[in-house]
Amino acid sequence: MPLLNEVARQRAIIYRWFSQLLFQELSDEGLLRLRDKENLALLNALKLIPELSLLVTHFQRRLRAMLKREECRLELAADFASLFLLPAPSGVSPYAGHYPHTNSPEERQALRQKLVEHRLAPQNNEAVDHIAIQLALMTALIEEGVEREQQDLFLNRHLLSWLPLCTKRCYQRDRFGFYAAAMGLLTGFVQQDSEWLIACRLATHPARPGQS
């Protein structure tokens, strides 16, 4: 594995954090991690990005409110199930293939092959286009030092093509608001990450006069 610079390391940590948050109902251990200093430091780091400041603040408010619930783990598990496990129109699908303008069957097969190559293929019949699995693959691409152009291509083909619509539906249907706030922050981060990758590419390979 290549030696990661600090920016790449932090990006991988953030994508892994979102993947773990959205994969399934949080365990007691998962809830404890949301309270720890590392989680606080991660959110504070994201808050330093101006475009994410309000999204982080909103997520922190929903997180604090969630942790004050009497049976917070059980109630949060119920929130997760009612939002992501129920079919539409009650729930919101966390699968890319359920949204328009996403990938073709051939591209989904290529995605499955990538997951096999990175030893991330789901073992429990989970579809490869689940949001958490795609975020885990993005983490692996960063950690393996895949070219930034390919990382941005992955973000746009497999995440940004459907995340905004998914997030909009979460805001409409998540009654408590914790997971909607998490999805809003995720979408904002992915958009900013894509813009950063583009800026890095332009700085490395500036357009020549006359090129668009």
From Swiss-Prot:
GO terms for biological process: protein folding. It comes from the Bacteria. It is found in: Cytoplasm. Keywords: Chaperone, Cytoplasm. Its main location: cytoplasm. GO terms for cellular component: cytoplasm. Transmembrane segments: none annotated. The keyword Zinc does not apply. The keyword Zinc-finger does not apply. Involved in the biogenesis of TorA. Acts on TorA before the insertion of the molybdenum cofactor and, as a result, probably favors a conformation of the apoenzyme that is competent for acquiring the cofactor. Belongs to the TorD/DmsD family. TorD subfamily. This is Chaperone protein TorD.
